[in-house]
Amino acid sequence: MNAFVTVGSTQFDDLIRAVLKPEFQHCLVKHGINQLIVQYGKGKQAFGDPKSVAGLTILGFDYAPEIESYIHDASIVISHAGAGSILQTLRSGKRLLVVPNESLMDNHQVELATKLASMNYLVTCSTSNLVEGLEELYPKILTPFPKSDCSTFQKVMQDVAR
C-alpha cells in the first residue's frame, strides 16, 4: 500500500519536511503503508535525499502532467489544501488528510479544509500535528463525497469566499 503526498504547484517545504520525519514514517508503516510517494513541487531542496525507516520506501518527483494515477494508486492522500487537489482526491473516494499551507498570503486553505472536515469528507491538521492527523484519519469513517454532483463543493467554495 502506498501514501501519496502532493503540494501542488506551490512551495510547501514544511509539509515535505513533516512527511519525511521518522515518527511520521513509523506511523505510516504501522498502518500498513510501505511506500511514500511525494510530489514536492518547488521543494526539491526540502525533499533532498530522504532517509526512510525500515519497511518504507520513499520516492519523489517535482511535477507530473497529471496526478490522477498517483491518487488512484494510493491508499491515502496527504495534500495541501488547494481546491483542485482536494476535489480530485474526494472524487476518487480516497482517504484524505489535508494540511493547509498557512504561510500563503490571503489564504483560504484553512477555511476550505475546516469546512470540508466539518462535513466529514476529510481530516485536516497542521504540519506540526501530522502524526495525530494520520491517527485520526485511520479509524474514522468518512462521508463519501458525491461523485457527479459538484454543488456540494461549489457551496463550500461560496461559503469560504464570503
Curated annotation (Swiss-Prot):
InterPro entries: Alg13-like, Glyco_trans_28_C. GO terms for biological process: dolichol-linked oligosaccharide biosynthetic process. One of its GO terms (molecular function) is N-acetylglucosaminyldiphosphodolichol N-acetylglucosaminyltransferase activity. It catalyses: an N-acetyl-alpha-D-glucosaminyl-diphospho-di-trans,poly-cis-dolichol + UDP-N-acetyl-alpha-D-glucosamine = an N,N'-diacetylchitobiosyl-diphospho-di-trans,poly-cis-dolichol + UDP + H(+). It is an enzyme of class 2 (transferase). Its EC number is 2.4.1.141. Transmembrane segments: none annotated. GO terms for cellular component: cytoplasmic side of endoplasmic reticulum membrane; UDP-N-acetylglucosamine transferase complex. The keyword Endoplasmic reticulum applies. The keyword NADP does not apply. Its main location: endoplasmic reticulum. It is found in: Endoplasmic reticulum. Keywords: Endoplasmic reticulum, Glycosyltransferase, Transferase. Belongs to the glycosyltransferase 28 family. Involved in protein N-glycosylation. Essential for the second step of the dolichol-linked oligosaccharide pathway. Heterodimer with alg14 to form a functional enzyme. This is UDP-N-acetylglucosamine transferase subunit alg13. It comes from Schizosaccharomyces pombe (strain 972 / ATCC 24843). The gene is alg13.
